[in-house]
Swiss-Prot record:
The protein, known as: UDP-glucose 6-dehydrogenase
Statement: the UniProt record of this protein carries the keyword NAD: yes
Taxonomy of the source species: Eukaryota, Metazoa, Chordata, Craniata, Vertebrata
InterPro entries listed in its UniProt record: 6-PGluconate_DH-like_C_sf, NAD(P)-bd_dom_sf, UDP-Glc/GDP-Man, UDP-Glc/GDP-Man_DH_C, UDP-Glc/GDP-Man_DH_C_sf, UDP-Glc/GDP-Man_DH_dimer, UDP-Glc/GDP-Man_DH_N, UDPglc_DH_euk
Active-site residues annotated for this sequence: 161, 220, 276
Organism: Mus musculus
Length: 493
């Protein structure tokens, strides 16, 4: 049996960094090297201030960094020395050419494959960690076969990650399952068993699933599509609840107690974000269209359409509640990350809500406890979001929630940070213009509505009528836009 003693991971991002840190932590006899072309990112991994925020990550890294966990820009040497190479690079949605806006861009995967074969001799296991379309492993193998050399034996596996940002370390230490896909040949199965042995250091054998390569690749896309579908489904019900007087939380509890349905991912909100859900669902849509399955493609496209609708609907509600105009009005945006306990802003609903309000001339004062000012500016300066001067003219980054809300017409909660439940809302109300509005896009203030109304707030929340005198709104009038639109200008910083 092949014994893995040295691991190289290409890509030091949200997947590669935490995953390999946990592997090093759980397998002290294995030397793990995480490499990246981004020198600043590697320097951050080697510093006290890690490049990403994730609860528990710092403690894991510090327990083994410099012992059996290393971060480096020396990619070629790390590949040459490794028994196993993880490919954990970005697979963004294409912004140009065929499949624009839906297909995955595999240029970084291809670059990794070419670099691996160039720097490899003998036997090596190459493992997809990035989310890729079905049969991406076949493309990697074709590159290997076309560049083979004497005694070179590269085995390709699929080992998708199922971690969630904000709970990544917990998910990695105690996964629901580990999925490993490989060729159904003796050589392929030998590679599968070798990778299984790494995870068996801490994962029970019954939680390690082995499949063929294509099933493993599709399982990752399907899992994210199903989770996104759940969110869009409950968000569609939230619109119905607001129209009828029902409470979406009560409806979610009622249906979630049905064991056939379950209660996870039934939290209505302003919409899902993050690097995976939209990208992977669109990739699935494109795959279905390419395979001449238009009905299946349209089905999954509706998951994205509902998410877009929920964001536009929420923004319309803000505008209409503020007497049908937000022009020159100060609005506090609390939360910019796509979810709590992470600093990741990719596809964050806060970007979309900010875009809609900026287009109406609102002055936004934004606060997030983990997203740096520079990242907010870059995100809002994306070509699909703002005009050249909009960010500098309409956006202020606040140092705390109280500063953001001072003199505001409304505060809008876009991220479910726990700290937003503990704010001194009497203090905030005194400093806001009246009537003072709260738009709770994450329902973090459930249970506080009576108290907040007593203070004097007008409250609007997802999936429930709270304020007794609410101005009717007409959802869907805001035009769509996408962060996947091809750039025609450079972002400002």
């Amino acid at each position: 049996m092949v014994e893995i003693k040295k691991i190289c991971c290409i890509g030091a991002g949200y997947v590669g960094g935490p995953t390999c840190s946990v592997i090093a932590h759980m397998c002290p006899e294995i030397r793990v090297t995480v490499v990246d072309v981004n020198e600043a990112r590697i320097n951050a991994w080697n510093s006290p201030t890690l490049p990403i925020y994730e609860p528990g990550l710092k403690e894991v890294v510090e327990s083994c960094r410099g012992k059996n966990l290393f971060f480096s820009t020396n990619i070629d040497d790390a590949i040459r020395e490794a028994d196993l190479v993880f490919i954990s690079v970005n697979t963004p949605t294409k912004t140009y050419g065929m499949g624009k806006g839906r297909a995955a861009d595999l240029k970084y995967i291809e670059a990794c494959a070419r670099r691996i074969v160039q720097n490899s001799n003998g036997y090596k296991i190459v493992t997809e960690k990035s989310t890729v379309p079905v049969r991406a492993a076949e493309s990697i193998r074709r590159i290997f076969d076309a560049n083979t050399k004497p005694n070179l034996n590269l085995q390709v596996l699929s080992n998708p990650e199922f971690l969630a940002e904000g709970t990544a370390i917990k998910d990695l230490k105690n996964p629901d399952r580990v999925l490993i896909g490989g060729d159904e040949t003796p050589e392929g199965q030998k590679a599968v068993r070798a990778l299984c042995a790494v995870y068996e250091h801490w994962v029970p054998k019954e939680k390690i699933l082995t499949t063929n390569t294509w099933s493993s690749e599709l399982s990752k896309l399907a899992a994210n599509a199903f989770l996104a579908q759940r969110i869009s489904s409950i968000n569609s019900i939230s619109a119905l609840c607001e129209a009828t007087g029902a409470d979406v939380e009560e409806v979610a509890t009622a249906i979630g107690m049905d064991q056939r349905i379950g209660n996870k991912f039934l939290k209505a909100s302003v919409g899902f974000g993050g690097s995976c859900f939209q990208k992977d669902v669109l990739n699935l849509v494109y795959l279905c269209e390419a395979l001449n399955l238009p009905e299946v493609a349209r089905y999954w496209q509706q998951v994205i359409d509902m998410n877009d609708y929920q964001r536009r609907r929420f923004a319309s509600r803000i505008i209409d509640s503020l007497f049908n105009t937000v022009t020159d009005k100060k609005i506090a945006i609390l939360g910019f990350a796509f979810k709590k306990d992470t600093g990741d802003t990719r596809e964050s609903s806060s970007i979309y809500i900010s875009k809609y309000l900026m287009d109406e001339g609102a002055h936004l004062h934004i606060y997030d406890p983990k997203v740096p000012r520079e990242q907010i500016v870059v995100d809002l300066s994306h070509p699909g979001v703002s005009a050249d001067d909009q960010v500098s003219r309409l956006v202020t980054i606040s140092k705390d929630p109280y500063e953001a809300c001072d003199g505001a017409h409304a505060l809008v909660i876009c991220t479910e940070w726990d700290m937003f439940k503990e704010l001194d809302y009497e203090r905030i109300h005194k400093k806001m213009l009246k009537p003072a509005f709260i738009f709770d896009g994450r329902r973090v203030l459930d249970g506080l509505h009576s108290e907040l109304q007593t203070i004097g707030f007008q409250i609007e929340t997802i999936g429930k009528k709270v304020s007794s005198k609410r101005i009717p709104y007409t959802p869907g009038e805001i035009p769509k836009f996408s962060l996947q639109d091809p750039p025609n200008k450079k972002p400002k910083v």
